[in-house]
Design a protein with these regions (language model features):
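Short, surface-exposed "cap/lid" segments of acyl-processing enzymes
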Residues: 7-10, 19-65, 94
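An N-terminal hydrophobic leader/cap segment in hydrolases
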Residues: 1-24, 219, 234
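Active-site signature of alpha/beta-hydrolase-fold catalytic machinery across serine-
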Residues: 118-122
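Short beta-to-alpha linker loops that shape the active-site pocket of alpha/beta-hydrolase fold enzymes
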Residues: 36, 60-70, 135, 226-228
Length: 260
């Protein structure tokens, strides 16, 4: 693993590069797109393991923090959906230069999957876009976070304006507006690459997205791999999720070890 900073020197992004550990490097590389806030914390260990397994399979892998998150530059209230999608594009270009490849696959979890799907509509250098338990509709996603926070705080308050705290992380009005506009059912087809949705359980929102893509004749491979997927839960111990079956399934998908 090689930690480093990249992108704009005045607002650098923090990344960890995993070089290929197999004898022969693959011709494509992989960018991992994290979820946000408490889901980031729950997923960090899983992403690290996924990156290691992919590097052992011969991929160059980059996992990174969006602007205003983790160890990247920016205050925690400075980012928004537009900036985070731009960060993914920056990470793609950085990995292509670092690994010397022309094609990159994206693996995104939760909001990271939603952002990856948006980026894919604009890129012609993608091989696969793996949407792992994606946030299909942003409005109910945000509403659930806000209601849960209100319940935990033991009081109701107007959260329609300004910045509120979500598990210790700021949710600004700009962030909220961007997240609420997410609706993968209206997704523009990827400009390149194959789109794959890998889900831990068959929630109604996942099935609705699959059916919407089928109705619009947008290619989507749908895989249900039963495993833990309660990313939005967090306890006082900061427990991580490490769903081995779905991690192995994503590796198999990217290495063509699964039958399409």
């Amino acid at each position: 693993m090689n930690p480093f900073f990249f992108g704009n020197s005045k607002q650098p992004l923090y990344g960890v590069y995993h070089p290929p550990r197999a004898h022969t490097a693959r011709p494509t590389a992989v960018v991992l797109c994290y979820p946000l806030w408490q889901e980031y914390m729950r997923a960090h260990r899983a992403f690290r393991q996924l990156a290691i397994l992919l590097s052992k399979a011969g991929f160059s892998v980059l996992r990174f923090d969006y602007f205003g998150t983790g160890d990247s530059a920016g205050e925690s209230d400075a980012g928004d959906v537009s900036r985070w999608t731009h960060d993914i594009a920056t990470a793609i270009d950085e990995l292509k230069d670092t690994a010397g490849v022309t094609k990159v696959s994206l693996v995104g979890l939760r909001v990271g999957a939603s952002l990856a799907a948006a980026v894919a509509a604009e890129r012609k250098d993608l091989d696969r876009i793996v949407l792992w338990d994606p946030v299909v509709a942003g409005k109910p996603y945000v509403e659930k976070m806000v209601l849960t926070e209100q319940a935990d705080a033991g009081a109701r308050r107007d959260a329609t304006l300004g910045t509120i705290g979500i598990k210790g992380f700021p949710l600004t009005s700009r962030m909220r507006q961007g997240l609420e506009h997410i609706d993968l059912r209206d997704l523009t087809a990827p400009a390149s690459g194959r789109m794959i949705m890998t889900v831990s359980d068959e929630r109604a929102e996942f099935v609705a997205f699959r059916d919407a893509m089928a109705g619009r004749r947008i290619g989507l491979t749908y895989r249900h791999i039963p495993s833990a997927g309660n990313w939005d839960e967090i306890d006082q111990f900061g427990s991580a999720l490490l769903p081995q079956s779905i991690i192995q399934g994503i590796v198999a998908c990217l290495t063509d070890a699964e039958v399409a």
